[in-house]
UniProtKB/Swiss-Prot annotation:
GO terms for cellular component: cytosol. Expressed in coronary artery and kidney. This is 5-oxoprolinase. Its EC number is 3.5.2.9. Catalyzes the cleavage of 5-oxo-L-proline to form L-glutamate coupled to the hydrolysis of ATP to ADP and inorganic phosphate. The modification Phosphoserine is found at S1265. Residues 1249-1269 are annotated as: Disordered. Signal peptide: none annotated. Belongs to the oxoprolinase family. Homodimer. The modification Phosphothreonine is found at T151. One of its GO terms (molecular function) is 5-oxoprolinase (ATP-hydrolyzing) activity. It comes from Bos taurus (Bovine).
Length: 1288
């Protein structure tokens, strides 16, 4: 932040609530200022007002607000702003039209086809950023040299392409003129394969600008990376947000003389670099505000702490941002914000819905914090505006916040202090619920004081914030205890010591400007210019010269751009990156070679191969040396170094620190006399023993008992965190510890999953994340499970309990079991479950179990992939394991398991496993994941004791049971109030006519129910048979949906339920029955029947639409979305997966680049949703044109029986599978078949619609469809990982 001497340098963080101003004044001293971001009664623009006030204070001359400010004394202004974020959240951007290749009209509506919330029956409609769609007549495909193909063109990646249809500019002109006449001035242009061949997009863009469109965002310019869906979302976001940002910038400039012509004005981008205001664009601005904080602690805490890795902890009002810095910024290149996926470099900032304004609830015996927030208005109860009780209120009740340290800006007139009385009153209402449960609940206990309740909520909030930090560190091979916790933001100081203790950290660093660290980060940030282009080259010696040439060209672009901004070459540095992956995988890593100098076997820019292997090994625990490495993208990041040096270091104070006052703070042992210090009066070397409070105008720091704070030579606060005092926890139920154990148990399952994903080698487990990890009690009952893959929810406990019954005393330390048999709780054979019994000193039987279930891509059988559409016996579907000791006496039984995996080859027409190497590697990874779970539970037992941990395993199951009993009673009460019986029933049919019948009898006094499937059809000669475990999984899924809120998903969900399934039926077939279709099809019908009996919603598409394509050198499998059923108060979502699956679909550009197909159409099947007062969602039309001979297999349902409507709603349309031969002949394939296809043939899949709800003729006004929530409670790589896990 350099510039002429004697002038001001401003760094401004314009947040959603407050604007922070950091100014380096002439002479080097610093002024800081905090003001409201919105105060229209007093000023138009907060950053301008902040600058005016500081100029006025420093100059001693009144500067009227209604006159532009003189810029002669201003050298630079740097700003981070939430303008783009707020426009995205509030959907207040520009009116936009999307121009997309014909056949892909609804591509961005469908997106990945996965739903965001697995258990929300009212699947929210995606609120797309565009207002209209124009389909562009053009088509470019990858060149394969087929007969009749035209002359190929070469893309910038090096790929050859074929222009099958030039862009029809004449036909497009009239359509664009129509858009202009309707007032639309901003366009997003998204054409297939434009990442490598952009000419069509450029032609469309030129025409649009010629016609007068004011902003045109080309996807090939917004982010030239393969995958049209995220690239299209990015282009739309750019078109939607950039005009808004430009208007804000222009308005800001008008507040200054000469419109800032002679002032360097820079804006913070999402990647942590500054950009000139004229090139500040919407898709790069969404994390502009939070990015400043990361830069701030990277430039301060990391340096001061001697290069020790740092976890950034920024706790605000509605959420907490968590990030990591260990010498270089950690970027992600795709993340979702406010329901929009952006493909652009962004700092990996993980946001969790736990902030000062997070609301507090007591639900079914569990303390719950968030994700709902009080927001800025009305705010927490203590704001005196009738708001709900929040984390801030809990801290105020505990004495950890002092009302006197806050300005009097609260209440309706915004002139009153914080109100502890309002906090106590609001919390007392929750405490009454808590104590009613404690005295009248299943385990009567002594009531809690108001302070104990407040303390409980604070502890639960702390544990919620620890989970993403563990995921951000341990999941990537880092030890959280080896980090420093850098705390900033208004609310973080009250929680920092507790967070650090829980994670084993011994140091908390709080910068003296922690309340304005994002503004400070802007002052310290570098100016960045990036250049990137896609690539399609192998990383091999023969391509190194090309890679050097490309990197050199991009480096020149970056250097020239920074020189144009006034940086001399001596202040410019560049860093080169390659986006690398192993061939045949999707897991690409953006790697820099700055720590790996060039060698004889590398490009001149550095040894990227060594960097890739090193990082791959660190993140995943293995490498794949036999596979070639591929370059997806080349990137150069140019940096113009900031020259700011802070000179406002506080002077040392002589004498002991002065206590400003004494107050009473509540801790675990009760109230303690707590001294209060003013930060401004503390000097270098002052040491403060906890407990104490350190106050300044922007934050409150709580130093807990057993901790010691010291003022460093730079004026910061470094807290040495003492070991946590061992708390005595009994086996009796304590709701506070129940909530904490709930988080700990879930964290164990999540970390098991991270180890499995890191160490597995197959695409299914490593990239598609098709696995579950779980923790079980001593009786085999499920305690916690992550992720929540619906078809695994109830099945894994059946598997564990079968092994307990089967082996009993024949389980010994060092044993690990393998099972997949349907009779032993298996779902289908490719899902292999690895179970480890855990022994403890002094115990003769296992004290708990851990297990991991992963979908293996092939375990033999009659077809590749082990999912044949026409199997009639279990043996045809692959290798079978009933109760197999995978590890015996600590030794992995490789020879025996290899023999078992090859055994299907002895059956006529079958093959053994076709990928033994991946099977063995993934089984070892599952064993390693289980071992991690054992270690983590061992740590828990070491902290609390075996009896306490086992007791809380039981308590957490009882909590889930209570939530289900409450739901069943509420359902029964509602029926009684309407004079209806307590018995409900439903019936539906599979396409072969097999009935699925259900009768549910509610017992009101017990809050229980009998689910009786008697009358369901017999076992079928085919593969639609569903093992008993499938029905239990479907039932747990439905119960969770009916409860309608977050509850622990475990064995307790089924405790209030007795399930009757007739032996020998389609829902409990004989041990040798084929079952692969039961897992993917019958499970959906079971869900439809259960939800139909409860009247919860109409039937969804009831199918996963399984499509397989393969030949001697290629295999592809996908499931395709359809319509969701409507319900009481919502329309069904169109083009989405429902219920027992949530699989993401392959991006069209990836599909066409890796497989011999052209995707001709992928759009909604308009009108296929059932009519009703609330309409069912529409299905999908998907057309694949084949470019090679192959075998096409379809395994589908709802081709004969329509998805039902409810309450007078009409059914959704049946699905349809058509094959259009090259000669024009059309064949209906039916629901289940395998058929050879040839070049020129087209498969046309029409997926079913969802049923309607309510009378279509009902004249009542239709409410709007549920939309994506306008807040983004969670964001970042941890959130994306969990979302991906739940999308399988």
């Amino acid at each position: 932040m350099g510039g002429p001497e004697g002038r001001f340098h401003f760094a401004i963080d314009r947040g959603g609530t407050f604007t922070d101003v950091f100014a380096q004044c002439p002479g080097g001293h610093v002024r800081v200022l905090k003001l409201l971001s919105e105060d229209p009664a007093n000023y138009v623009d907060a950053p301008t007002e902040g600058i005016r006030r500081i100029l006025e204070q420093e100059g001693g001359v009144l500067l009227p607000r209604d006159r532009p400010l003189d810029t002669s004394r201003i050298a630079s202004i740097r700003m981070g702003t939430t303008v783009a974020t707020n426009a995205l959240l509030e959907r207040q951007g520009e009116r936009v039209a999307l121009l997309v290749t014909r056949g892909f009209r609804d591509l961005l509506h469908v997106g990945t086809q996965a739903r965001a919330d697995l258990f929300d029956l009212a699947v929210p409609m995606p609120e797309t950023l565009y207002e209209e769609v124009l389909e562009v007549d053009e088509r470019v495909v990858l060149y394969r040299g087929e007969p009749g193909a035209g002359t190929p063109v070469k893309g910038c990646t090096g790929d050859l392409l074929e222009v099958q249809q030039p862009v029809d500019l004449g036909g497009l002109r009239g359509k664009l003129e129509g858009l202009l006449s309707r007032g639309i001035r901003s366009l997003a242009v998204v054409l297939m394969h434009s990442y490598t061949w952009a000419q069509h997009e450029q032609q469309v863009g030129a025409l649009a600008r010629e016609l007068g469109f004011t902003h045109v965002s080309l996807s090939s310019e917004a982010m030239p990376m393969v995958r049209i869906v995220p690239r299209g979302h990015t282009a739309c976001a750019d078109a939607y947000l950039t005009p808004t940002i430009q208007r804000y910038v222009q308005g800001f400039r008008r507040g200054f003389q000469g419109q800032l012509k002679d002032v360097q004005v820079l804006f913070m981008r999402s990647d942590g670099g500054l950009a000139p205001m004229d090139s500040f664009s919407g898709s790069r601005a969404v994390l502009s505000g939070p990015a400043g904080g990361v830069v701030g602690y990277s430039a301060t805490t990391y340096r001061v702490e001697g290069g020790q890795p740092v976890i950034g902890f920024d706790m605000g009002g509605t959420s907490t941002d968590v990030s990591r810095y260990a010498g270089e910024f950690e970027h992600v290149f795709e993340a979702s914000t406010a329901g929009v996926t952006l493909q652009a470099p962004q700092l990996d900032i993980n946001t969790v819905a736990a902030g000062g304004g997070s609301r507090l609830f007591f639900r079914s015996g569990l303390f719950v914090v968030g994700p709902e927030s009080a927001g800025a208005h009305p705010g927490p109860a203590c704001y005196r505006k009738g708001g709900p009780v929040t984390v801030t209120d809990a801290n105020l009740v505990l004495g950890r916040l002092l009302p006197a340290s806050f300005p009097c800006i609260f209440g309706p007139g915004e002139d009153q202090p914080l109100s502890p009385e309002a906090s106590r009153k609001a919390l007392e209402a929750v405490a009454t619920e808590v104590n009613s449960f404690l005295t009248n609940g299943p385990c009567p206990a002594s009531p809690l004081s108001l302070e104990e309740v407040a303390m409980g909520f604070v502890r639960v909030a702390n544990e919620a914030m620890c989970r993403p930090i563990r995921a951000l560190t341990q999941a990537r091979g880092h030890d959280p205890s080896a980090h420093v916790l850098a705390c900033f933001g208004g609310a973080g100081g009250q929680h920092a010591c507790a967070i650090a203790r829980a994670l084993g950290m011994d140091t908390v660093h709080i910068h003296r400007h922690s309340g304005l660290l994002s503004a400070l980060g802007l002052a310290l940030a570098d100016v960045v210019h990036e250049a990137q282009e896609p690539c399609s080259l192998p990383y091999a010696p023969e391509t190194f010269a090309q890679l050097d040439q490309r990197l050199g060209r991009l480096e020149e672009q970056c250097v020239e751009a920074l020189r144009a901004q006034g940086f001399p070459r001596s202040q410019i540095s560049t860093e080169s990156f390659l986006h690398l992956r192993y061939q045949g995988t999707d897991c690409a890593l953006m790697v820099s070679a700055h720590q790996h100098p060039a060698s004889a076997r590398s490009p001149r820019a550095g040894d990227f191969g060594a960097a890739f292997v090193e990082r791959y090994m660190r993140e995943f625990g293995f490498i794949i040396p036999e596979r070639p490495v591929v370059v997806d993208d080349v990137r150069v990041r140019g940096t113009g170094s900031s020259s700011l040096r802070l000179e406002d270091v506080p002077k040392a104070h002589s004498g002991p620190p002065r206590v400003d006052k004494m107050t009473q703070c509540y801790f675990e042992g009760g109230y303690q006399e707590t001294p209060v210090y003013l930060l401004g009066e503390l000097g270098c070397g002052h040491k403060l023993q906890g407990p104490c409070l350190i106050i300044d105008s922007n934050s409150t720091i709580l130093v807990e008992p057993g901790c010691q704070a010291e003022v460093t030579e730079t004026g910061d606060i470094r807290i040495s965190v003492g070991a946590e005092t061992a708390s005595v926890v009994g086996t009796q139920l304590d709701p506070i510890h129940l909530s904490i154990f709930s988080h700990r148990f879930m964290s164990i399952a999540e970390q098991m999953g991270r180890i499995l994903q890191r160490t597995a080698i197959s695409t299914n487990i490593k990239e598609r994340l098709d696995f579950s990890c779980a923790l079980f009690g001593p009786d085999g009952g499920l305690v916690s499970n992550a992720p929540h893959i619906p078809v695994h929810l109830g099945a894994m406990q059946e598997t564990v309990q079968f092994q307990i019954q089967q082996l009993g005393a024949d389980l010994h330390p060092g044993d690990v079991l393998l099972s997949n048999h349907p009779s032993a709780g298996g779902s289908h054979l490719p899902d292999l479950t690895v179970i480890t019994p855990v022994f403890w000193p002094g115990q003769t039987r296992p004290v708990f179990y851990v297990a991991s279930r992963g979908h293996h891509a092939d375990i033999g059988g009659i077809t590749p992939g082990s999912m044949p559409p026409h199997s009639t016996s279990l043996q045809q579907e692959g290798a079978v394991f009933l109760s197999f000791k995978l590890v015996h006496g600590g030794v992995f039984q490789e020879e025996a398991v290899t023999e078992a995996l090859r055994a299907p080859g002895k059956i006529p027409g079958c093959s053994g496993t076709r990928n033994l190497h991946d099977n063995l590697s993934d089984l070892r990874a599952q064993v390693a994941a289980n071992q991690k779970g054992i270690q983590l539970v061992g740590e828990l037992i070491g902290q609390y004791g075996l009896d306490v941990v086992q007791a809380y395993m039981g308590h957490i199951q009882a909590n889930a049971e209570l939530a289900v009993r409450d739901m069943l009673r509420a359902f029964g009460t509602a029926r009684q109030a309407r004079g209806l019986p307590l018995e409900v029933s439903a019936e539906d049919h599979m396409d072969d006519g097999s009935p699925i019948r259900l009768r549910v009898q509610i017992n009101m006094s017990q809050g229980s129910a009998v689910f009786d499937f008697s009358g369901s059809g017999p076992e079928v000669f085919g593969n639609l048979n569903a093992p008993r475990a499938i029905t239990l999984s479907a039932l747990i899924y439905c119960l969770r949906c009916l409860v309608g809120r977050d509850i622990p998903l475990n064995q307790g969900c089924l405790a209030p339920v007795r399930v009757v399934i007739p032996k020998g039926s389609i829902l409990d077939p004989s041990p040798d029955a084929a079952v692969v279709g039961g897992n993917v099809l019958t499970s959906q019908r079971v869900v439809d029947v259960i939800l139909g009996a409860f009247g919860a919603c109409a039937a969804s598409q009831g199918c996963m639409n399984n499509v397989t394509l393969g030949n001697a050198h290629m295999g592809y499998y996908e499931t395709v979305a359809g319509g969701a059923g409507a319900g009481p108060g919502w329309h069904g979502r169109s083009g989405v997966h429902s219920h027992m699956t949530n699989t993401r679909i392959t991006d069209p550009e990836i599909l066409e680049s890796r497989y011999p197909v052209i995707l001709r159409r992928f759009e909604l099947r308009l009108g296929s949703g059932g009519r009703g007062r609330f309409r069912g969602g529409d299905g999908i039309i998907r057309e694949l044109l084949f470019r090679e001979e192959a075998l096409l297999s379809v395994l589908t349902e709802r081709r004969a029986f329509q998805p039902y409507g409810l309450m007078g709603g009409e059914p959704g349309a049946r699905g349809l599978n058509l094959l259009i031969r090259k000669d024009g002949r059309t064949v209906n394939l039916g629901g289940k078949t395998s058929v050879p296809v040839y070049p020129g043939d087209v498969f046309c899949l029409h997926t079913p619609g969802g049923g309607g709800y309510g009378d279509p003729e009902d004249p009542a006004p239709l409410p709007g469809s549920p939309l994506q929530p306008l807040a983004f409670p969670e964001r970042g790589s941890v959130y994306e990982y969990r979302r991906a896990q739940e999308a399988v």
